[in-house]
Protein backbone atom coordinates (compact mmCIF):
# COMPACT_ATOMS: atom_id res chain seq x y z
CA UNK A 1 0.00 0.00 0.00
CA UNK A 2 1.40 3.39 -1.01
CA UNK A 3 1.51 6.39 1.32
CA UNK A 4 -1.25 8.15 -0.66
CA UNK A 5 -4.40 6.85 -2.30
CA UNK A 6 -5.83 9.17 -5.00
CA UNK A 7 -9.25 9.17 -6.69
CA UNK A 8 -10.46 11.42 -9.52
CA UNK A 9 -13.92 12.73 -10.42
CA UNK A 10 -15.09 12.87 -6.81
CA UNK A 11 -17.84 15.30 -5.74
CA UNK A 12 -17.77 16.85 -2.26
CA UNK A 13 -21.12 17.54 -0.58
CA UNK A 14 -23.22 17.57 -3.78
CA UNK A 15 -20.91 20.08 -5.45
CA UNK A 16 -21.48 20.92 -9.12
CA UNK A 17 -17.81 20.52 -9.94
CA UNK A 18 -15.79 17.37 -9.41
CA UNK A 19 -12.36 17.27 -7.84
CA UNK A 20 -9.47 15.08 -6.81
CA UNK A 21 -9.56 13.28 -3.47
CA UNK A 22 -6.40 12.06 -1.73
CA UNK A 23 -6.18 9.87 1.40
CA UNK A 24 -3.09 9.78 3.62
CA UNK A 25 -2.27 8.58 7.12
CA UNK A 26 -2.84 12.05 8.57
CA UNK A 27 -6.22 12.52 6.94
CA UNK A 28 -7.63 13.30 3.53
CA UNK A 29 -8.14 16.32 1.26
CA UNK A 30 -10.30 17.35 -1.71
CA UNK A 31 -9.53 20.01 -4.32
CA UNK A 32 -11.82 21.06 -7.20
CA UNK A 33 -10.55 20.55 -10.73
CA UNK A 34 -11.19 24.14 -11.76
CA UNK A 35 -9.24 25.50 -8.83
CA UNK A 36 -10.43 26.92 -5.55
CA UNK A 37 -10.28 26.26 -1.84
CA UNK A 38 -9.04 22.86 -0.70
CA UNK A 39 -10.96 20.98 1.96
CA UNK A 40 -9.01 18.86 4.46
CA UNK A 41 -10.01 16.70 7.43
CA UNK A 42 -7.69 15.37 10.11
CA UNK A 43 -7.83 11.63 10.79
CA UNK A 44 -8.55 12.27 14.49
CA UNK A 45 -11.82 13.97 13.49
CA UNK A 46 -13.24 10.89 11.75
CA UNK A 47 -15.86 9.23 13.96
CA UNK A 48 -17.40 6.74 11.51
CA UNK A 49 -17.69 6.02 7.79
CA UNK A 50 -20.35 4.44 5.61
CA UNK A 51 -20.26 3.08 2.05
CA UNK A 52 -23.47 3.14 -0.01
CA UNK A 53 -24.91 3.65 -3.47
CA UNK A 54 -25.40 7.30 -4.44
CA UNK A 55 -26.28 9.59 -7.36
CA UNK A 56 -22.97 9.48 -9.23
CA UNK A 57 -21.85 5.99 -8.31
CA UNK A 58 -20.89 5.10 -4.75
CA UNK A 59 -20.25 7.47 -1.88
CA UNK A 60 -18.45 7.57 1.43
CA UNK A 61 -20.31 9.37 4.20
CA UNK A 62 -18.04 10.47 7.05
CA UNK A 63 -19.31 11.59 10.46
CA UNK A 64 -17.05 14.09 12.22
CA UNK A 65 -16.22 13.88 15.91
CA UNK A 66 -15.97 17.55 16.84
CA UNK A 67 -18.80 19.27 14.98
CA UNK A 68 -21.06 16.25 14.48
CA UNK A 69 -21.19 17.19 10.82
CA UNK A 70 -21.61 14.99 7.76
CA UNK A 71 -19.15 14.89 4.84
CA UNK A 72 -20.18 13.21 1.59
CA UNK A 73 -17.73 12.05 -1.09
CA UNK A 74 -19.61 10.84 -4.18
CA UNK A 75 -18.33 9.40 -7.45
CA UNK A 76 -16.42 6.26 -6.44
CA UNK A 77 -16.61 3.03 -8.43
CA UNK A 78 -17.74 -0.26 -6.95
CA UNK A 79 -14.26 -1.77 -7.29
CA UNK A 80 -12.81 1.04 -5.11
CA UNK A 81 -14.42 -0.38 -1.99
CA UNK A 82 -11.58 -2.78 -1.09
CA UNK A 83 -8.91 -0.07 -1.33
CA UNK A 84 -10.95 2.37 0.74
CA UNK A 85 -11.86 -0.22 3.36
CA UNK A 86 -8.13 -0.86 3.95
CA UNK A 87 -7.43 2.89 4.12
CA UNK A 88 -10.03 3.47 6.85
CA UNK A 89 -9.10 0.34 8.78
CA UNK A 90 -5.32 0.74 8.74
CA UNK A 91 -4.93 4.52 8.82
CA UNK A 92 -8.03 5.76 10.63
CA UNK A 93 -8.92 2.72 12.76
CA UNK A 94 -12.47 2.91 11.44
CA UNK A 95 -14.61 0.26 9.78
CA UNK A 96 -16.05 1.33 6.41
CA UNK A 97 -19.56 -0.03 6.87
CA UNK A 98 -21.47 -1.00 3.73
CA UNK A 99 -25.18 -0.14 3.80
CA UNK A 100 -27.93 -0.78 1.30
CA UNK A 101 -30.80 1.67 0.87
CA UNK A 102 -34.48 0.75 0.82
CA UNK A 103 -35.70 0.78 -2.76
CA UNK A 104 -39.33 -0.26 -2.31
CA UNK A 105 -40.59 3.28 -2.81
CA UNK A 106 -42.77 3.28 0.30
CA UNK A 107 -43.59 6.64 1.85
CA UNK A 108 -44.14 5.20 5.34
CA UNK A 109 -41.50 4.00 7.71
CA UNK A 110 -39.66 4.97 10.88
CA UNK A 111 -37.82 8.22 11.58
CA UNK A 112 -34.72 7.88 13.75
CA UNK A 113 -32.58 10.64 15.26
CA UNK A 114 -28.86 9.95 15.31
CA UNK A 115 -26.01 12.19 16.38
CA UNK A 116 -25.62 13.97 13.04
CA UNK A 117 -28.68 13.27 10.92
CA UNK A 118 -32.31 12.23 10.70
CA UNK A 119 -32.74 8.82 9.06
CA UNK A 120 -35.99 7.61 7.51
CA UNK A 121 -35.92 3.80 7.39
CA UNK A 122 -38.18 1.32 5.61
CA UNK A 123 -37.94 -2.29 6.84
CA UNK A 124 -34.76 -1.45 8.78
CA UNK A 125 -33.05 -0.04 5.68
CA UNK A 126 -32.42 3.69 5.26
CA UNK A 127 -34.59 5.27 2.55
CA UNK A 128 -32.91 8.66 2.96
CA UNK A 129 -30.84 10.61 5.47
CA UNK A 130 -31.24 14.27 6.32
CA UNK A 131 -28.18 15.92 7.95
CA UNK A 132 -29.10 18.43 10.65
CA UNK A 133 -26.86 21.01 8.98
CA UNK A 134 -29.21 20.92 5.98
CA UNK A 135 -32.28 21.86 8.05
CA UNK A 136 -33.09 25.55 8.02
CA UNK A 137 -36.34 25.51 9.98
CA UNK A 138 -39.20 23.33 11.17
CA UNK A 139 -42.85 24.00 12.04
CA UNK A 140 -45.91 22.21 13.31
CA UNK A 141 -48.07 22.39 10.19
CA UNK A 142 -50.96 20.56 11.86
CA UNK A 143 -51.89 18.42 14.81
CA UNK A 144 -50.09 15.39 13.37
CA UNK A 145 -47.94 17.05 10.71
CA UNK A 146 -44.41 18.49 10.88
CA UNK A 147 -42.90 20.63 8.10
CA UNK A 148 -39.12 20.63 7.67
CA UNK A 149 -37.55 23.39 5.57
CA UNK A 150 -34.20 22.85 3.90
CA UNK A 151 -31.37 25.36 4.19
CA UNK A 152 -30.85 27.50 1.10
CA UNK A 153 -27.79 26.78 -1.06
CA UNK A 154 -26.21 30.14 -0.25
CA UNK A 155 -26.21 29.60 3.49
CA UNK A 156 -26.42 26.76 5.93
CA UNK A 157 -27.79 26.49 9.42
CA UNK A 158 -25.25 29.03 10.66
CA UNK A 159 -25.36 31.25 7.56
CA UNK A 160 -21.91 30.04 6.49
CA UNK A 161 -20.89 28.85 3.07
CA UNK A 162 -20.92 25.13 2.46
CA UNK A 163 -19.08 23.02 -0.05
CA UNK A 164 -15.33 22.91 0.31
CA UNK A 165 -15.69 25.03 3.44
CA UNK A 166 -18.16 22.46 4.82
CA UNK A 167 -19.51 24.67 7.57
CA UNK A 168 -23.10 24.83 6.54
CA UNK A 169 -25.30 23.62 3.77
CA UNK A 170 -24.07 21.55 0.87
CA UNK A 171 -22.25 23.39 -1.88
CA UNK A 172 -24.39 25.00 -4.56
CA UNK A 173 -26.79 22.27 -5.48
CA UNK A 174 -28.67 22.27 -8.77
CA UNK A 175 -31.35 24.73 -9.77
CA UNK A 176 -34.09 22.29 -8.79
CA UNK A 177 -33.69 21.18 -5.22
CA UNK A 178 -35.76 20.07 -2.26
CA UNK A 179 -36.91 23.02 -0.16
CA UNK A 180 -39.51 21.45 2.14
CA UNK A 181 -40.51 18.03 3.43
CA UNK A 182 -43.53 17.09 5.56
CA UNK A 183 -43.94 14.18 7.94
CA UNK A 184 -47.31 12.85 9.07
CA UNK A 185 -46.87 11.41 12.57
CA UNK A 186 -50.09 10.21 14.26
CA UNK A 187 -50.56 8.90 17.78
CA UNK A 188 -48.58 9.39 20.99
CA UNK A 189 -45.12 8.24 22.05
CA UNK A 190 -42.38 8.87 24.62
CA UNK A 191 -39.13 10.74 24.21
CA UNK A 192 -37.14 7.54 24.65
CA UNK A 193 -38.98 5.88 21.78
CA UNK A 194 -38.59 8.96 19.59
CA UNK A 195 -34.85 9.46 20.10
CA UNK A 196 -33.94 5.80 20.40
CA UNK A 197 -30.39 5.17 21.56
CA UNK A 198 -29.57 8.89 21.73
CA UNK A 199 -32.30 9.60 24.30
CA UNK A 200 -31.30 11.51 27.41
CA UNK A 201 -30.87 10.10 30.89
CA UNK A 202 -33.92 11.81 32.41
CA UNK A 203 -36.07 8.75 32.96
CA UNK A 204 -39.06 10.69 34.29
CA UNK A 205 -39.51 12.73 31.13
CA UNK A 206 -38.62 9.79 28.88
CA UNK A 207 -41.59 7.72 30.02
CA UNK A 208 -44.14 10.55 29.78
CA UNK A 209 -46.42 10.08 26.77
CA UNK A 210 -46.82 13.01 24.41
CA UNK A 211 -48.23 13.79 20.99
CA UNK A 212 -45.86 12.10 18.55
CA UNK A 213 -45.75 15.00 16.09
CA UNK A 214 -45.04 17.53 18.85
CA UNK A 215 -42.28 15.36 20.30
CA UNK A 216 -40.75 14.88 16.84
CA UNK A 217 -40.82 18.66 16.33
CA UNK A 218 -39.20 19.42 19.70
CA UNK A 219 -36.52 16.77 19.21
CA UNK A 220 -35.64 18.07 15.76
CA UNK A 221 -35.33 21.63 17.07
CA UNK A 222 -32.94 20.39 19.74
CA UNK A 223 -30.87 18.20 17.40
CA UNK A 224 -30.63 20.72 14.57
CA UNK A 225 -29.91 23.56 17.00
CA UNK A 226 -32.82 25.66 15.85
CA UNK A 227 -33.99 28.35 18.23
CA UNK A 228 -32.69 29.09 21.72
CA UNK A 229 -29.59 26.90 21.34
CA UNK A 230 -28.27 29.32 18.70
CA UNK A 231 -26.95 31.54 21.52
CA UNK A 232 -28.05 33.74 24.40
CA UNK A 233 -31.09 35.91 23.85
CA UNK A 234 -30.20 39.61 23.79
CA UNK A 235 -33.81 40.86 23.88
CA UNK A 236 -37.30 39.36 23.76
CA UNK A 237 -40.63 40.96 22.83
CA UNK A 238 -43.80 38.97 23.49
CA UNK A 239 -47.06 38.73 21.55
CA UNK A 240 -46.24 41.23 18.79
CA UNK A 241 -48.99 41.66 16.19
CA UNK A 242 -47.88 40.89 12.63
CA UNK A 243 -49.99 41.94 9.65
CA UNK A 244 -47.78 39.95 7.23
CA UNK A 245 -47.62 37.03 7.81
CA UNK A 246 -50.82 37.34 9.82
CA UNK A 247 -50.67 36.40 13.50
CA UNK A 248 -49.00 37.14 16.80
CA UNK A 249 -45.36 36.17 17.30
CA UNK A 250 -42.80 36.37 20.08
CA UNK A 251 -39.56 37.98 18.88
CA UNK A 252 -36.31 36.51 20.23
CA UNK A 253 -33.26 38.51 19.18
CA UNK A 254 -29.81 36.90 19.12
CA UNK A 255 -26.39 38.06 18.05
CA UNK A 256 -26.61 36.97 14.39
CA UNK A 257 -30.30 36.18 13.94
CA UNK A 258 -33.78 36.65 15.35
CA UNK A 259 -36.67 34.26 15.72
CA UNK A 260 -40.42 34.68 15.30
CA UNK A 261 -42.26 32.15 17.45
CA UNK A 262 -45.98 31.74 16.81
CA UNK A 263 -48.59 29.18 17.78
CA UNK A 264 -48.29 27.34 14.46
CA UNK A 265 -45.20 28.62 12.65
CA UNK A 266 -41.69 29.51 13.76
CA UNK A 267 -39.21 31.44 11.65
CA UNK A 268 -35.48 31.81 12.08
CA UNK A 269 -34.13 34.81 10.15
CA UNK A 270 -30.56 36.01 9.78
CA UNK A 271 -29.94 39.74 10.13
CA UNK A 272 -28.08 39.52 6.82
CA UNK A 273 -31.40 38.67 5.16
CA UNK A 274 -32.84 42.08 6.10
CA UNK A 275 -32.42 44.27 3.02
CA UNK A 276 -34.82 47.09 3.96
CA UNK A 277 -36.18 48.42 7.24
CA UNK A 278 -38.94 51.04 7.43
CA UNK A 279 -40.90 52.74 10.20
CA UNK A 280 -44.27 53.98 8.88
CA UNK A 281 -46.93 55.90 10.85
CA UNK A 282 -50.43 54.60 10.21
CA UNK A 283 -52.98 57.23 9.09
CA UNK A 284 -55.23 56.39 12.06
CA UNK A 285 -52.64 58.23 14.24
CA UNK A 286 -52.84 55.37 16.74
CA UNK A 287 -50.40 52.76 15.34
CA UNK A 288 -46.94 52.48 13.82
CA UNK A 289 -45.88 49.80 11.34
CA UNK A 290 -42.38 48.31 11.15
CA UNK A 291 -41.64 46.81 7.73
CA UNK A 292 -38.69 44.52 6.93
CA UNK A 293 -37.77 43.49 3.40
CA UNK A 294 -36.22 40.00 3.39
CA UNK A 295 -34.10 38.17 0.84
CA UNK A 296 -34.56 35.23 0.85
CA UNK A 297 -38.22 35.64 1.80
CA UNK A 298 -40.08 33.71 4.46
CA UNK A 299 -41.88 30.57 3.34
CA UNK A 300 -45.17 29.26 4.68
CA UNK A 301 -45.92 26.20 2.60
CA UNK A 302 -46.12 27.41 -0.99
CA UNK A 303 -46.55 31.05 0.07
CA UNK A 304 -43.59 33.41 0.13
CA UNK A 305 -43.41 36.55 2.25
CA UNK A 306 -40.73 38.99 1.04
CA UNK A 307 -41.86 41.52 3.67
CA UNK A 308 -42.62 41.23 7.37
CA UNK A 309 -45.04 43.88 8.64
CA UNK A 310 -45.39 44.45 12.39
CA UNK A 311 -47.86 46.79 14.08
CA UNK A 312 -47.41 48.60 17.40
CA UNK A 313 -49.53 51.05 19.35
CA UNK A 314 -48.12 54.55 19.25
CA UNK A 315 -48.41 55.20 22.98
CA UNK A 316 -47.30 51.74 24.22
CA UNK A 317 -44.22 52.20 26.41
CA UNK A 318 -41.66 49.53 27.35
CA UNK A 319 -38.70 49.24 29.69
CA UNK A 320 -36.00 46.71 28.79
CA UNK A 321 -32.39 45.90 29.66
CA UNK A 322 -30.29 44.20 26.99
CA UNK A 323 -28.47 40.98 27.86
CA UNK A 324 -25.09 42.52 26.99
CA UNK A 325 -22.28 43.88 29.14
CA UNK A 326 -20.54 47.20 28.56
CA UNK A 327 -17.50 45.62 26.89
CA UNK A 328 -19.66 43.82 24.31
CA UNK A 329 -21.63 46.99 23.62
CA UNK A 330 -18.45 48.95 22.93
CA UNK A 331 -16.40 46.30 21.13
CA UNK A 332 -19.06 44.58 18.98
CA UNK A 333 -21.66 47.26 18.43
CA UNK A 334 -19.63 50.47 18.82
CA UNK A 335 -22.29 52.20 20.88
CA UNK A 336 -25.04 51.43 18.34
CA UNK A 337 -26.98 49.87 21.20
CA UNK A 338 -27.79 51.12 24.68
CA UNK A 339 -27.85 48.91 27.77
CA UNK A 340 -31.24 50.27 28.87
CA UNK A 341 -34.30 51.47 26.96
CA UNK A 342 -37.42 53.22 28.27
CA UNK A 343 -39.30 54.48 25.23
CA UNK A 344 -42.31 53.69 23.01
CA UNK A 345 -42.21 50.03 21.99
CA UNK A 346 -41.94 50.64 18.24
CA UNK A 347 -38.91 52.89 18.74
CA UNK A 348 -37.14 50.35 20.97
CA UNK A 349 -37.69 47.48 18.51
CA UNK A 350 -36.49 49.62 15.60
CA UNK A 351 -33.34 50.75 17.43
CA UNK A 352 -32.38 47.22 18.48
CA UNK A 353 -32.89 45.90 14.94
CA UNK A 354 -30.78 48.77 13.62
CA UNK A 355 -28.00 48.01 16.09
CA UNK A 356 -27.93 44.22 15.72
CA UNK A 357 -28.65 44.12 11.99
CA UNK A 358 -26.63 47.21 11.09
CA UNK A 359 -29.41 48.45 8.83
CA UNK A 360 -30.52 51.99 8.05
CA UNK A 361 -34.09 52.90 9.01
CA UNK A 362 -36.20 54.52 6.28
CA UNK A 363 -39.20 56.77 6.89
CA UNK A 364 -41.71 58.67 4.71
CA UNK A 365 -40.43 61.63 2.71
CA UNK A 366 -40.97 65.02 4.35
CA UNK A 367 -41.81 66.64 1.00
CA UNK A 368 -45.18 64.92 0.74
CA UNK A 369 -48.18 65.07 3.01
CA UNK A 370 -51.84 64.30 2.34
CA UNK A 371 -54.75 66.72 2.64
CA UNK A 372 -55.32 65.29 6.13
CA UNK A 373 -51.71 66.09 7.15
CA UNK A 374 -50.70 62.40 7.08
CA UNK A 375 -47.98 60.42 5.28
CA UNK A 376 -50.03 57.38 4.30
CA UNK A 377 -52.49 57.45 1.38
CA UNK A 378 -55.48 55.15 1.67
CA UNK A 379 -55.84 53.14 -1.56
CA UNK A 380 -56.05 49.58 -2.82
CA UNK A 381 -54.30 47.07 -5.07
CA UNK A 382 -57.10 45.18 -6.79
CA UNK A 383 -59.38 44.07 -3.93
CA UNK A 384 -56.80 44.54 -1.15
CA UNK A 385 -57.00 47.80 0.78
CA UNK A 386 -53.94 49.34 2.35
CA UNK A 387 -51.76 52.43 2.52
CA UNK A 388 -49.30 53.87 0.01
CA UNK A 389 -46.24 55.71 1.36
CA UNK A 390 -43.92 57.94 -0.62
CA UNK A 391 -40.41 57.36 0.71
CA UNK A 392 -37.31 59.27 -0.29
CA UNK A 393 -36.33 56.68 -2.89
CA UNK A 394 -39.34 54.43 -3.41
CA UNK A 395 -43.07 53.71 -3.14
CA UNK A 396 -44.17 51.36 -0.37
CA UNK A 397 -47.63 49.77 -0.14
CA UNK A 398 -48.59 47.90 3.04
CA UNK A 399 -49.75 45.66 4.53
CA UNK A 400 -50.84 43.11 1.92
CA UNK A 401 -49.64 42.59 -0.69
CA UNK A 402 -46.57 44.49 0.51
CA UNK A 403 -45.17 46.21 -2.60
CA UNK A 404 -41.90 48.13 -2.93
CA UNK A 405 -41.12 50.12 -6.10
CA UNK A 406 -37.92 52.16 -6.37
CA UNK A 407 -38.13 55.50 -8.17
CA UNK A 408 -35.07 54.60 -10.25
CA UNK A 409 -36.96 51.58 -11.61
CA UNK A 410 -40.00 53.68 -12.55
CA UNK A 411 -40.47 54.71 -16.17
CA UNK A 412 -43.64 56.79 -15.76
CA UNK A 413 -46.54 57.56 -13.42
CA UNK A 414 -50.04 58.00 -14.86
CA UNK A 415 -53.04 59.59 -13.13
CA UNK A 416 -56.33 58.33 -14.51
CA UNK A 417 -60.02 58.53 -13.71
CA UNK A 418 -61.92 55.52 -12.41
CA UNK A 419 -63.77 54.32 -15.49
CA UNK A 420 -67.46 53.61 -14.99
CA UNK A 421 -67.36 54.12 -11.21
CA UNK A 422 -69.86 56.12 -9.20
CA UNK A 423 -66.98 57.75 -7.30
CA UNK A 424 -65.18 58.82 -10.49
CA UNK A 425 -65.39 62.48 -9.51
CA UNK A 426 -63.94 61.97 -6.00
CA UNK A 427 -61.21 59.34 -6.61
CA UNK A 428 -58.56 58.45 -9.17
CA UNK A 429 -55.99 55.74 -9.94
CA UNK A 430 -52.20 55.76 -10.17
CA UNK A 431 -50.46 53.40 -12.60
CA UNK A 432 -46.69 52.98 -12.13
CA UNK A 433 -44.98 51.65 -15.25
CA UNK A 434 -41.62 49.97 -14.64
CA UNK A 435 -38.57 50.16 -16.87
CA UNK A 436 -37.36 47.42 -19.23
CA UNK A 437 -40.83 45.93 -19.57
CA UNK A 438 -40.92 44.76 -15.96
CA UNK A 439 -44.67 45.33 -15.77
CA UNK A 440 -46.77 47.85 -13.89
CA UNK A 441 -48.60 48.35 -10.61
CA UNK A 442 -51.92 50.14 -10.14
CA UNK A 443 -53.06 51.87 -6.95
CA UNK A 444 -56.81 52.57 -6.99
CA UNK A 445 -59.41 54.67 -5.16
CA UNK A 446 -57.11 57.52 -4.13
CA UNK A 447 -58.81 60.67 -2.87
CA UNK A 448 -59.00 63.41 -5.51
CA UNK A 449 -57.85 65.93 -2.92
CA UNK A 450 -54.35 64.38 -2.94
CA UNK A 451 -53.89 64.70 -6.71
CA UNK A 452 -52.00 67.99 -6.82
CA UNK A 453 -49.74 67.10 -3.89
CA UNK A 454 -48.78 63.77 -5.48
CA UNK A 455 -48.17 65.35 -8.87
CA UNK A 456 -45.91 67.99 -7.36
CA UNK A 457 -43.97 65.39 -5.34
CA UNK A 458 -43.41 63.10 -8.33
CA UNK A 459 -42.14 66.00 -10.42
CA UNK A 460 -39.85 66.96 -7.54
CA UNK A 461 -38.38 63.44 -7.65
CA UNK A 462 -37.82 63.73 -11.40
CA UNK A 463 -40.47 61.18 -12.37
CA UNK A 464 -42.28 61.36 -15.68
CA UNK A 465 -45.92 62.19 -14.91
CA UNK A 466 -48.91 61.90 -17.23
CA UNK A 467 -52.18 63.41 -16.00
CA UNK A 468 -55.01 61.86 -18.00
CA UNK A 469 -57.60 63.34 -15.64
CA UNK A 470 -56.88 66.94 -16.72
CA UNK A 471 -56.71 65.86 -20.36
CA UNK A 472 -60.11 64.20 -20.08
CA UNK A 473 -61.50 67.27 -18.35
CA UNK A 474 -60.19 69.56 -21.10
CA UNK A 475 -61.62 67.33 -23.82
CA UNK A 476 -64.96 67.17 -22.01
CA UNK A 477 -65.06 70.95 -21.61
CA UNK A 478 -64.27 71.46 -25.30
CA UNK A 479 -66.97 68.99 -26.30
CA UNK A 480 -69.53 70.70 -24.06
CA UNK A 481 -68.63 74.13 -25.45
CA UNK A 482 -69.02 72.84 -28.99
CA UNK A 483 -72.36 71.30 -28.09
CA UNK A 484 -73.54 74.57 -26.56
CA UNK A 485 -72.51 76.50 -29.67
CA UNK A 486 -74.39 74.05 -31.88
CA UNK A 487 -77.52 74.28 -29.73
CA UNK A 488 -77.44 78.11 -29.81
CA UNK A 489 -77.22 78.07 -33.60
CA UNK A 490 -80.16 75.67 -33.75
CA UNK A 491 -82.28 77.87 -31.46
CA UNK A 492 -81.52 80.96 -33.57
CA UNK A 493 -82.52 79.14 -36.75
CA UNK A 494 -85.79 78.08 -35.19
CA UNK A 495 -86.49 81.68 -34.12
CA UNK A 496 -86.13 82.92 -37.71
CA UNK A 497 -88.67 80.39 -38.96
CA UNK A 498 -91.13 80.95 -36.14
CA UNK A 499 -93.36 83.71 -37.75
CA UNK A 500 -93.96 81.71 -40.88
CA UNK A 501 -94.87 78.62 -38.90
CA UNK A 502 -97.33 80.48 -36.74
CA UNK A 503 -99.23 81.86 -39.80
CA UNK A 504 -100.11 78.43 -41.06
CA UNK A 505 -103.34 77.06 -39.68
CA UNK A 506 -105.34 73.94 -40.45
CA UNK A 507 -108.87 72.95 -39.61
CA UNK A 508 -109.33 70.07 -37.24
CA UNK A 509 -112.27 68.20 -38.68
CA UNK A 510 -112.66 66.05 -35.58
CA UNK A 511 -113.12 69.04 -33.29
CA UNK A 512 -116.80 69.72 -32.38
CA UNK A 513 -117.70 72.67 -30.18
CA UNK A 514 -121.16 71.41 -29.31
CA UNK A 515 -120.07 67.96 -28.18
CA UNK A 516 -120.05 67.14 -24.56
CA UNK A 517 -116.91 65.90 -22.85
CA UNK A 518 -116.68 62.36 -21.65
CA UNK A 519 -114.48 63.53 -18.84
CA UNK A 520 -117.29 65.36 -17.14
CA UNK A 521 -119.43 62.27 -17.19
CA UNK A 522 -116.68 60.27 -15.58
CA UNK A 523 -115.58 62.65 -12.86
CA UNK A 524 -118.49 65.09 -12.22
CA UNK A 525 -120.83 63.64 -9.62
CA UNK A 526 -123.57 66.15 -10.56
CA UNK A 527 -123.48 65.36 -14.26
CA UNK A 528 -126.33 63.30 -15.73
CA UNK A 529 -125.94 61.68 -19.10
CA UNK A 530 -128.59 61.39 -21.85
CA UNK A 531 -131.07 58.55 -21.58
CA UNK A 532 -130.81 58.17 -17.83
CA UNK A 533 -132.99 59.20 -14.93
CA UNK A 534 -136.83 59.70 -14.64
CA UNK A 535 -139.27 61.47 -16.92
CA UNK A 536 -139.28 64.54 -14.68
CA UNK A 537 -135.62 64.98 -15.27
CA UNK A 538 -136.21 64.86 -19.02
CA UNK A 539 -138.88 67.53 -18.77
CA UNK A 540 -136.61 69.70 -16.72
CA UNK A 541 -133.88 69.27 -19.29
CA UNK A 542 -136.23 70.32 -22.08
CA UNK A 543 -137.29 73.38 -20.14
CA UNK A 544 -133.66 74.20 -19.51
CA UNK A 545 -132.92 73.86 -23.23
CA UNK A 546 -135.76 76.25 -23.99
CA UNK A 547 -134.35 78.74 -21.53
CA UNK A 548 -130.96 78.39 -23.18
CA UNK A 549 -132.49 79.09 -26.57
CA UNK A 550 -134.20 82.21 -25.21
CA UNK A 551 -130.91 83.33 -23.79
CA UNK A 552 -129.24 82.89 -27.14
CA UNK A 553 -131.93 84.93 -28.88
CA UNK A 554 -131.66 87.75 -26.42
CA UNK A 555 -127.85 87.57 -26.22
CA UNK A 556 -127.39 90.72 -28.26
CA UNK A 557 -129.48 92.87 -25.87
CA UNK A 558 -128.19 91.27 -22.67
CA UNK A 559 -125.99 94.17 -21.81
CA UNK A 560 -128.80 96.72 -22.17
CA UNK A 561 -131.63 94.91 -20.40
CA UNK A 562 -131.90 94.88 -16.63
CA UNK A 563 -131.67 91.55 -14.97
CA UNK A 564 -134.96 89.79 -14.26
CA UNK A 565 -135.99 89.41 -10.70
CA UNK A 566 -136.33 85.89 -9.50
CA UNK A 567 -139.80 84.81 -8.43
CA UNK A 568 -140.17 83.78 -4.87
CA UNK A 569 -142.88 82.03 -3.25
UniProtKB/Swiss-Prot annotation:
<keyword id="KW-0158">Chromosome</keyword>
<comment type="function">
    <text>Component of the FACT complex, a general chromatin factor that acts to reorganize nucleosomes. The FACT complex is involved in multiple processes that require DNA as a template such as mRNA elongation, DNA replication and DNA repair. During transcription elongation the FACT complex acts as a histone chaperone that both destabilizes and restores nucleosomal structure.</text>
</comment>
<dbReference type="Pfam" id="PF08512">
    <property type="entry name" value="Rttp106-like_middle"/>
</dbReference>
<dbReference type="Pfam" id="PF03531">
    <property type="entry name" value="SSrecog"/>
</dbReference>
<dbReference type="GO" id="GO:0035101">
    <property type="term" value="C:FACT complex"/>
</dbReference>
<feature type="compositionally biased region" description="Basic and acidic residues">
    <location>
        <begin position="491"/>
        <end position="500"/>
    </location>
</feature>
<dbReference type="GO" id="GO:0042393">
    <property type="term" value="F:histone binding"/>
</dbReference>
<protein>
    <recommendedName>
        <fullName>FACT complex subunit POB3</fullName>
    </recommendedName>
</protein>
<dbReference type="GO" id="GO:0006260">
    <property type="term" value="P:DNA replication"/>
</dbReference>
<keyword id="KW-0805">Transcription regulation</keyword>
<dbReference type="InterPro" id="IPR035417">
    <property type="entry name" value="SSRP1/POB3_N"/>
</dbReference>
<dbReference type="GO" id="GO:0006281">
    <property type="term" value="P:DNA repair"/>
</dbReference>
<keyword id="KW-0227">DNA damage</keyword>
<keyword id="KW-0234">DNA repair</keyword>
<dbReference type="InterPro" id="IPR000969">
    <property type="entry name" value="SSRP1/POB3"/>
</dbReference>
<dbReference type="Pfam" id="PF17292">
    <property type="entry name" value="POB3_N"/>
</dbReference>
<keyword id="KW-0539">Nucleus</keyword>
<feature type="region of interest" description="Disordered">
    <location>
        <begin position="482"/>
        <end position="569"/>
    </location>
</feature>
<dbReference type="InterPro" id="IPR048993">
    <property type="entry name" value="SSRP1-like_PH1"/>
</dbReference>
<dbReference type="InterPro" id="IPR024954">
    <property type="entry name" value="SSRP1_DD"/>
</dbReference>
<dbReference type="InterPro" id="IPR038167">
    <property type="entry name" value="SSRP1_sf"/>
</dbReference>
<comment type="similarity">
    <text>Belongs to the SSRP1 family.</text>
</comment>
<keyword id="KW-0804">Transcription</keyword>
<dbReference type="InterPro" id="IPR050454">
    <property type="entry name" value="RTT106/SSRP1_HistChap/FACT"/>
</dbReference>
<feature type="compositionally biased region" description="Acidic residues">
    <location>
        <begin position="537"/>
        <end position="559"/>
    </location>
</feature>
<dbReference type="Pfam" id="PF21103">
    <property type="entry name" value="PH1_SSRP1-like"/>
</dbReference>
<dbReference type="InterPro" id="IPR011993">
    <property type="entry name" value="PH-like_dom_sf"/>
</dbReference>
<dbReference type="InterPro" id="IPR013719">
    <property type="entry name" value="RTT106/SPT16-like_middle_dom"/>
</dbReference>
<comment type="subunit">
    <text>Forms a stable heterodimer with SPT16. The SPT16-POB3 dimer weakly associates with multiple molecules of NHP6 to form the FACT complex.</text>
</comment>
<dbReference type="GO" id="GO:0031491">
    <property type="term" value="F:nucleosome binding"/>
</dbReference>
<dbReference type="GO" id="GO:0003677">
    <property type="term" value="F:DNA binding"/>
</dbReference>
<keyword id="KW-0235">DNA replication</keyword>
